[in-house]
């Protein structure tokens, strides 16, 4: 059994496909690309694969990770080509790496994620982008905490979101403000 980590991009209309559908999509892609993937045992065998921190619907990505186990493998280049040949526009495999037997799972390796956030077109602030960016940046650095109340089925919990933000910046791209966030996962 060989462990493989796959890095892929999700963009365009595929950003509207949910995690479970992406998982089924990759299961079909593995079969079509003739990847010799391992199956679980039991009455309902399924392909052994796990996604690291799957994104929500509507979010594009340049780096999502998927771990699989295979019985045998070809070269990384051949596997990437075989998978990409089966993919529709909007999903692209960018890396296919063999892992050591004692490698941690992709889920446990992801500690943070980088996000670029844009205003929806037509909803940009009326102020000059630089003035707006300076104001937001100043507000973020001066504020000691950002408290929210997280509600679960059984309780409510107050959380400080600022502790989860490792990096924050506001810049201008194509005349529009862009928020950059590196946040804990």
Which residues does each PLM region occupy?
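Structured-RNA-binding interfaces characteristic of tRNA pseudouridine synthases
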Residues: 37, 48-185
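Glycine/small-residue-rich interface belts in oligomeric ring/scaffold proteins
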Residues: 3, 12, 17-65, 76
């Amino acid at each position: 059994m060989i462990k493989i980590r796959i890095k892929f991009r999700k963009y365009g209309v595929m950003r509207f496909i949910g995690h479970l559908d992406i998982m089924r999509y990759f299961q079909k892609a593995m079969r079509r690309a003739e990847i010799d993937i391992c199956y679980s045992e039991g009455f309902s065998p399924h392909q052994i694969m796990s996604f690291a921190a799957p994104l929500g619907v509507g979010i594009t990505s340049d780096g999502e990770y998927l771990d699989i186990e295979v019985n045998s493998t070809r070269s990384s280049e051949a596997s990437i080509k075989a998978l990409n040949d089966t993919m529709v526009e909007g999903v692209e495999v960018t890396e296919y790496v063999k892992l050591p037997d004692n490698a941690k799972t992709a889920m446990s390796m992801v500690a943070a994620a980088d996000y670029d956030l844009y205003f929806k077109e037509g909803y940009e602030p009326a102020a000059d982008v630089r003035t707006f960016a300076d104001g937001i940046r100043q507000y973020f650095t001066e504020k000691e905490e950002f408290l929210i109340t997280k509600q679960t089925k059984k309780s409510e919990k107050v959380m400080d979101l600022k502790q989860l933000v490792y990096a924050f910046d506001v810049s201008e791209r194509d005349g529009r403000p862009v928020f950059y966030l590196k946040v804990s996962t």
